[in-house]
Structures are given as structure tokens and as C-alpha cells.
Regions:
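Short, surface-exposed loop and linker segments with low hydrophobicity and enrichment for Pro/Ser/Thr
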Residues: 49-52, 296-305
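Bacterial Sec-dependent N-terminal signal peptides
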Residues: 1-7, 13-52
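Secreted, disulfide-rich extracellular signaling modules
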Residues: 12-13, 236, 299-302
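Generic detector of well-ordered alpha-helical segments enriched in charged/polar residues
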Residues: 42-46, 242, 337-345
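Extracytoplasmic/luminal low-complexity segments enriched in Pro/Gly and acidic/polar residues
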Residues: 275-300
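Chitinase-like catalytic core of GlcNAc-active glycosidases
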Residues: 52-284, 305, 309, 314, ...
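Generic recognition of flexible, low-complexity loop/linker segments
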Residues: 44-45, 73-74, 295-296
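Short, low-complexity, Pro/Ser/Thr/Gly-rich segments in the mature regions of secreted, periplasmic
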Residues: 330-352
């Protein structure tokens, strides 16, 4: 077992998270006192996020309940060291006229808008728009002209809201916009977003079953694989993650590959029981290893991965871990966002 290490940039929230233990029902809210730090801390945090490291990535929707007293429903309550947030409940706006037609998936959420831009400005967190990438049920025709118009529509949604990029959820399920057409779609967007655009804006593709073509790779910053445990699953092994990466390893560098869990289903324990390649089932703190932290610890045999993360990770704000004695946990107090906080530490351990 690796030596216990505390990543000092994990955030004041993770270091000072002595909280009252909560019930295991997600609807029970905890009020978390907002913690602050000095400017040097935030400068170090921003510098860390600009460095070459495996990132923490997540789809987040909790901000849509901006009136909630729970920190789990606010951008400012997120772990400081999350690198990229994909907006799963629309783009927050502070301009009600901007969202009248909702053409760009914008929502009038002024509190969320301010908090989102605070974590971008102060904590260096990048925030990207997210869309399920299908042309059906849109206003755009299934033609080359329609393809380009749809691509430019998504680019504009990023630029007019000054976001940090775009996450395309590639799950065509028979949609016209797939295969070679999706590659062309990526090439168009790639003129304005992604590594070939020189814009500083991210272009991300996330996917589950259908795999994007290798020709998309030069245009994309990260490929995020939904390595989701089924809702009724109880365990996962590192070998499963390796197979997920091997499917694209001939053309996708490991540093572009992000592995993610379905935390909306598996929030109580931080995933399902996880077994590493060497048979280990314990984390660096002596607690039973579950798949979110297991994904953070894992790397493909080809090299360091791009990162780890989760879908609907806000569900884990109310957790009993790592103090759930029924699972074999060894600690005394629960930690909000336990799996993400500890996963970041496992993935990027501090140096002695």
C-alpha cells in the first residue's frame, strides 16, 4: 500500500472538512461553512491547474438549485482542485433577455453565474458547455450546410458566454451525425476550439459505446470515456479500465484519456468495490477501495492517463465515507465529496 500523502493544493475545504456526519439519504442536506484562504493559496492553486498533471473532471448539475442552502448545490462548494466542470444543466446566465428563446441552452441563474465565474477567476477551474451531440430534433438539416451551421451554433454558445470550451457527448444511437460526419463536425469546431485552434479553448469528446474515429484526435484535448459501472453492479477491476483504453490506444495518447464513473447511481460508497491489477483492494488511508478512487489510482500500461472523474458527482456531497464502519472504513468523520477529494490526492500525490 502506498504511503499516505496529503496533496496540499486539494483545498481548504478538504483539509478542514471536520463535518457533522450525515444520513445516507441524498435528500438530507448539510450546511457547510464557506472557507476562505489567502491569495498565495489561490495563486498556488491556479498554478497547479496550469501544470502538466492528470486532471479531475466532472459533469455537474447541482447549480440549477441555486437557492439551496446546501454547498453541494453551489459552485463555491466544490472541491478546490477539480480542474474541469462540464455543465450538465445548461449555461448559467445573469441576463434574462439572453435566455428568452433558450436557443443556446442558457438559463437565467444569476447566483450560479456569479459563483461559476468566481471559481474560474479565483480557483482556476475551467468550465465547459456540454451537449448530447445529435442533429435530430434540432433546427438543422441533415446536409453539409446543416452540419456546419450546427457546429457553428455550438461554437457560438461557448464564445458568447465566454466559457472555457465545449464537451460533446458522442452517443449517436443511430443519429445521422456519426462516423465520418462526426469527424467533419469536429474538424469544423476545431477551427475555433481545441488544440489546433490556438484559442486556448477546450474541445472534449465524451463517449460510452460508440467510439469516435481516430481522425478526430488532433482536434480534441481530451477523450472522456464513460466507464460506468451498471446500476446493479457490485464490483469493478482495473483490467476493465485497461480494455476500455486499449480500444482507442492505437491513436489516443494516454494523457488524453479520462476515465469516469456514474456517481449518480453509486454515490453512497464512491462507486463499486474495486480491485487493482495486483489484487489490492485498499486505498492509501487503509479504507476499502471503491471505483472512483480506484480510477484515480489507475493508469493504463501505456503511461499516465489524462485524469478521472464522475457523472452527477454532486450526489456524493452527502456521504458517510470514510467513516462508514459497515464497509470497513477506518476514519472517524465523513468528508463531503470524499471520492473526488481523496481521488485527487491519490492521482497526484504530494512530493516529500
Amino acid at each position: 500500500m502506498r504511503k499516505r500523502l496529503l496533496y496540499t493544493l486539494l483545498g481548504v475545504g478538504s483539509i478542514l472538512c471536520c463535518m457533522v456526519a450525515c444520513d445516507t439519504e441524498i435528500e438530507n442536506e448539510i450546511l457547510q461553512k464557506e472557507l476562505t484562504a489567502d491569495e498565495q493559496y489561490y495563486q498556488n492553486l491556479r498554478d497547479y491547474k496550469k501544470s502538466d498533471h492528470a486532471i479531475c473532471y466532472g459533469w455537474y448539475a447541482g447549480y440549477s438549485s441555486e437557492g439551496s442552502p446546501s454547498a453541494g448545490n453551489h459552485f463555491t462548494g466544490l472541491p478546490d482542485s477539480i480542474d474541469i466542470i462540464s455543465l450538465w444543466s445548461g449555461i448559467p446566465s445573469n441576463n434574462p433577455r439572453y435566455v428568452e428563446a433558450n436557443t443556446y441552452n442558457e438559463r437565467y441563474l444569476p447566483v450560479a453565474y456569479e459563483e461559476m465565474n468566481y471559481i474560474r477567476r479565483v480557483k482556476g477551474t475551467r468550465v465547459v458547455a456540454c451537449t448530447i451531440c445529435r442533429i435530430k430534433n434540432t433546427e438543422f438539416p441533415k446536409t453539409d450546410a446543416g452540419l456546419e451551421a450546427y457546429a457553428m451554433h455550438l461554437v457560438k454558445s461557448v464564445l458568447r458566454n465566454d466559457l472555457d470550451g465545449l464537451d460533446l457527448d458522442y452517443e449517436p444511437e443511430g443519429d445521422w451525425l456519426s462516423g465520418d460526419k462526426f469527424t467533419k463536425f469536429i474538424e469544423i469546431i476545431g477551427r475555433y476550439l481545441g488544440p489546433k485552434s490556438n484559442s486556448g479553448k477546450l474541445l472534449i469528446v465524451d463517449f460510452y459505446g460508440d467510439v469516435p474515429a481516430s481522425a478526430t484526435e488532433p482536434y480534441v484535448d481530451y477523450f472522456v470515456r464513460q466507464c460506468y459501472s451498471k446500476e446493479d453492479a457490485t464490483s469493478k477491476r482495473a483490467s476493465e479500465l485497461q480494455r476500455e483504453y486499449d480500444e482507442i490506444s492505437s491513436w489516443c495518447p494516454p494523457s488524453k484519456f479520462i476515465v469516469t464513473e456514474q456517481m449518480g447511481w453509486h454515490w453512497r460508497n464512491g462507486g463499486v468495490k474495486f480491485t487493482e491489477a495486483d489484487g489490492n483492494q485498499i486505498d492509501s488511508w487503509g479504507n476499502p477501495l471503491y471505483s472512483v478512487i480506484g480510477m484515480a489510482r489507475w493508469n493504463p500500461t501505456q503511461g499516465r492517463k489524462g485524469g478521472f472523474g464522475g457523472f452527477y458527482f454532486e450526489y456524493e456531497y452527502n456521504t458517510t465515507r470514510p467513516a462508514n464502519k459497515s464497509l470497513g472504513d477506518t476514519e472517524m468523520e465523513a468528508i463531503p465529496y470524499y471520492s473526488l477529494r481523496r481521488g485527487i490526492q491519490e492521482q497526484n500525490p504530494a512530493l516529500d
